[in-house]
Amino acid sequence: MELLVIIITLALIFDYINGFHDAANSIATIVSTKVLTPFQAVIWAAFFNFVAFFIAKCIIGGFGIANTVSKTVVEQYISLPFILSGVIAAIVWNLFTWWKGIPSSSSHTLIGGFAGAAIMAHGFDAIQLNIILKIAVFIFLAPFIGMVVAFGFTLLVLHICRRAHPNTAEMWFKKLQLVSSALFSIGHGLNDSQKVMGIIAAALIAAHSEGLGMGINSINDLPDWVAFSCFTAISLGTMSGGWKIVKTMGTKITKVTPLEGVVAETAGAFTLYLTEYLKIPVSTTHTITGAIIGVGATKRLSAVRWGITRSLMTAWVLTIPVSGILAAVIYGVVTLF
């Protein structure tokens, strides 16, 4: 029972860290265009992170991404020690990339840690390879979708607004950026909170198989406090902010105007809602980065700082294997006690 409580606590801590680690995804463009101050922006994003709970519960009527994450590992192999190892590895990698100002994926960190510890514990038979491969494909597909949608949407908006006075257009797009930022924050809450829900669900299922009182038989029995806690934790984390990554996302990839901020956030939100519909966990970091690149590419390819982009992509590719290896090492240490 104590181990289960520790895992749930650490998972919610990870969710909180995810909030301030990924806060930049929702607010970087709205801060860089000076529509809101950093403080105002994190409050705005945190509020809509939590609104996502009610959308998932009352409108969507379920938590499909949480179900996908909980099934990353074959149910018969799920155990509390390797879940603990995966969560610890995810926290360590997330804090390291936050400290370095690298916008890596909290989502893939968590899934990589979960899978890596499972492989260390039971071998490759323990993981659902089809789910892992689907998630891996969307490491590249999600930012590509965001980039293509943003590129096309930017050209469309520029054509529609070609006769508008620049000052009038900027005023309207600054107002619209409040809406686009809110839409993206809802997508962030929907996507990222459910990943932690999936891990907690797996822990509760493992607890049930071990005869512990708090356990559940399947994710369909997941109590409401799990979802409420996860959405609350990510909202509180978002309020804490992540200013190093805000700078990278908002200014280092490409300079962003209010019009471009609206387009990038709208394209990013579209991608997140699409993957929510498909029940595939994706990275909000990858998604908004792809959208920002798509916006920058409409000016000219040289407007995108490809050196920064390459370093981001390297971090993305390394996230799952590094967090997986780290989780495997931690599991080896945990089993010594």
Task: Label every PLM stretch briefly.
Residues M1-F337:
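Multi-pass alpha-helical transmembrane bundle typical of ion/small-solute transporters
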